[in-house]
Amino acid sequence: MKKRKILSLIAFLCISFIANAQQKLTSPDNNLVMTFQVDSKGAPTYELTYKNKVVIKPSTLGLELKKEDNTRTDFDWVDRRDLTKLDSKTNLYDGFEVKDTQTATFDETWQPVWGEEKEIRNHYNELAVTLYQPMNDRSIVIRFRLFNDGLGFRYEFPQQKSLNYFVIKEEHSQFGMNGDHIAFWIPGDYDTQEYDYTISRLSEIRGLMKEAITPNSSQTPFSQTGVQTALMMKTDDGLYINLHEAALVDYSCMHLNLDDKNMVFESWLTPDAKGDKGYMQTPCNTPWRTIIVSDDARNILASRITLNLNEPCKIADAASWVKPVKYIGVWWDMITGKGSWAYTDELTSVKLGETDYSKTKPNGKHSANTANVKRYIDFAAAHGFDAVLVEGWNEGWEDWFGNSKDYVFDFVTPYPDFDVKEIHRYAARKGIKMMMHHETSASVRNYERHMDKAYQFMADNGYNSVKSGYVGNIIPRGEHHYGQWMNNHYLYAVKKAADYKIMVNAHEATRPTGICRTYPNLIGNESARGTEYESFGGNKVYHTTILPFTRLVGGPMDYTPGIFETHCNKMNPANNSQVRSTIARQLALYVTMYSPLQMAADIPENYERFMDAFQFIKDVALDWDETNYLEAEPGEYITIARKAKDTDDWYVGCTAGENGHTSKLVFDFLTPGKQYIATVYADAKDADWKENPQAYTIKKGILTNKSKLNLHAANGGGYAISIKEVKDKSEAKGLKRL
């Protein structure tokens, strides 16, 4: 790690004439200014401007604690008749005075284990304000970090006699908007992020909420104006604003609730089964609340605030075993309804250890059988893939969902037609790793009971990565997917996996907040509406032009692109869904939807029909030295160029919405004086996601850093370009400049 640090600590004593004075913090480039003060009621307030434009109007900060429990000892007695005194103890939002302020500047460059660039700069100015509340004799710290691309702040609770153990009733962090901005939003929900995005004015959210809430396997929407982070907005005066959080550890996931009369968002935490929102023990802190802002949409995509606000890697040897993975899997045929996760249709109830599958009749549709898996292994080996995922391999799928069943899977017992040892031997001979699947059916207590045994089973049978799932309502019953208890579980699973040198791809878990910096074996997350929904009726055409501005702000997504046969009835006649994308855009998603874990999600037979287009999936890199955001507008288009790790090869991808998009590309990011062979995979002139999704063109030619190229993406279309350095002049023979 390269470091360049400048620390300047300036302590201001709590002198009466400056105690509640206004404090200003500027970004290193002076474009952002954050102003903090305590108002006349002793409430902490802040505001934020960017190039003299208001980003956050004056907004208050603080928390509300739960009333103290009625059960007490003689050592902790409070007079029950003194209700004023009792209620005041729940107040951590006013009655404060400034006790101390400290400022600092920090500048370092660090290297991620994997990522969108080789090095990341972490440069900010900091203000830490210690606030004292005389009526309760307690202190808190609000720490602000102002980067060139945005602001992060969090609450810190020092250990003290008057604040040791406490329960959070609600966090009241406000984000006051300066207008009725355009928002790219999904409904606030304690249990799912798998919604299509709605584009509307803030004032329209209430009226559109009912339509925006579509059915899901587990969902708990909480308000007519509640939305989830990361929330993307665009102002009428040309600012792009993103609200999210970073380093979500031992705390509840934050949503936002909008006061649509005053255009003020306020934090809304996910409750536990009792309705409480956080059990805390000092010293402790909240996650960071983040505000990314720019007058250029590309800078939202380029921001690394979320990663920079997380702690450095805690796995000492991570670089030796955490590696990007390109994989295929026994999955899409089941998603479309052609195949089945379950082994038999005869059982309506399964009891693990008691149900005898040898006495049942196979349904003939079970996809995770040895012969079929070997076929996938052969395909992966022939085309340079790293791994094969197999879902539905283990006993219990016949009654796995919707029964609030505790002991649902044991994660080690295969179905009769899945030979674990033979598949391990076969894959090893072919140089292919197997990817484990741990669907928990949201029975988290059961998963934790079996976790060590399940991870050891993986280690014994050649699995070094796992796709985990949490479909359904959480057990223990009443807990939510995004509450403090579950967030602690997700991190426990990742840390435990690291003990076995296992990489984790968590589905249905809390949306990422940059924790992959600290634990890079968290190599993938779903936490949004992915490709599977294309088989359940389809995603909105603009979906992939929004996700990088929202969900991917927190970390990579296992979006599972690469569907070439977009008509699902070709797989299953009963499924009339259509993937809302052209083939060219499916290729582009390997560049625009960043992840070190990339799946070629279609079945082998569909790739064999389009091997020329499939070549891009085979070629595209997973790990990057450099990323350039060439053009971007949320809801319309995104074009990204990435330089492959330790090479001078580049890959470009463009995804477009319903209006299509024409790019005027300039390749000045290429090395001067070098020639490159470019292979351009583009929509044909008559391509259209609905009418002609498989129409594409492929052309080769020479590029230099002075080249320019116009390319058109169709409705729901895109394009992809592989750009490889010419190392021998003979490689370019016969090719013309593009």
UniProtKB/Swiss-Prot annotation:
Binds 1 Ca(2+) ion per subunit. Optimum pH is 6.5. The record marks E194, W331, K467 as: Substrate. Pathway: Glycan degradation; starch degradation. Changing E508Q: Abolishes enzyme activity. GO terms for biological process: starch catabolic process. Residues 1-21 form the signal peptide. Keywords: Calcium, Carbohydrate metabolism, Glycosidase, Hydrolase, Metal-binding, Periplasm, Polysaccharide degradation, Signal. PANTHER family: GLUCAN 1,4-ALPHA-GLUCOSIDASE SUSB, GLUCAN 1,4-ALPHA-GLUCOSIDASE SUSB-RELATED. Pfam families: GH97_C, GH97_N, Glyco_hydro_97. Belongs to the glycosyl hydrolase 97 family. Its cofactor is Ca(2+). This is Glucan 1,4-alpha-glucosidase SusB. It catalyses: Hydrolysis of terminal (1->4)-linked alpha-D-glucose residues successively from non-reducing ends of the chains with release of beta-D-glucose. The gene is susB. The lineage of its organism: Bacteria, Pseudomonadati, Bacteroidota, Bacteroidia, Bacteroidales. Its main location: periplasm. It is found in: Periplasm. One of its GO terms (cellular component) is plasma membrane.
